[in-house]
């Protein structure tokens, strides 16, 4: 008897289209924009918001350029999670045996920003809301792509904020914050963002 597919397996299947996330980055971004999520127990094969966010995190590295001196060529390319981890095994499954320009992709869970300098992408969890300003201040102008679902994340200096719109996971971008850290976001990524802030934080709040 065939076993019921686990959620982490579902995000790779043709049934959901998430397999595009591993082989066709541009197609994956377009697909992720169209995926609706459901809370019904009958929709087991449909990715959850966290599954979709994990797929975005996995694909962001294909649309962002880091400074050449931001890490050793032989060091792993680290996607880090600070605080509450809502991804379970979804992110681990997506990056298994994957590389970025010859560097092995790894997932790291952090309890503070003290070791975040070794990360290339940092997802800041909900549990960090009260420490958000401090967390982002510690990473200011460092080549770490910061991502979160926290409210007002971009206003605090974060770079990419996930949003839920009409049961779909979308994202907004704070371009100056990324540029000040030496990161270059591709035009393909910016085109599919809900909004792109092009003003530095001090100007945007005037």
Where are these regions (language model features)?
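Short hydrophobic alpha-helices and adjacent helix-cap/hinge residues
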Residues: 2-6, 17-28, 36-206
């Amino acid at each position: 008897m065939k076993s019921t597919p686990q959620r982490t397996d579902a995000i790779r299947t043709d049934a959901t289209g998430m397999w595009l996330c591993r082989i066709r980055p541009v197609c994956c971004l377009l697909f992720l924009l169209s995926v609706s999520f459901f809370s019904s127990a009958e929709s087991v094969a449909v990715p959850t918001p966290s599954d979709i966010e994990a797929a975005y995190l996995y694909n962001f590295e294909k649309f962002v350029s880091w400074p050449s001196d931001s890490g050793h060529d032989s060091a792993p390319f680290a996607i880090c999670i600070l605080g509450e981890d809502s991804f379970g095994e979804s992110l681990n499954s997506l990056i298994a045996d994957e590389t970025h320009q010859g560097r092995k992709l790894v997932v790291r869970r952090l309890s503070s920003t003290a070791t975040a300098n070794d990360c290339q992408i940092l997802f800041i969890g909900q549990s960090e809301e009260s420490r958000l300003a401090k967390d982002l201040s510690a990473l200011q102008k460092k080549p770490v792509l910061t991502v979160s679902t926290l409210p007002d994340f971009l206003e605090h200096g974060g770079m990419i904020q996930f949003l839920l719109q009409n049961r779909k996971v979308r994202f907004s971008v704070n371009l100056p914050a990324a540029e000040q850290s030496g990161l270059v976001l591709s035009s393909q990524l910016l085109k599919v963002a809900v909004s792109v802030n092009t003003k530095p934080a001090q100007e945007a709040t005037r």
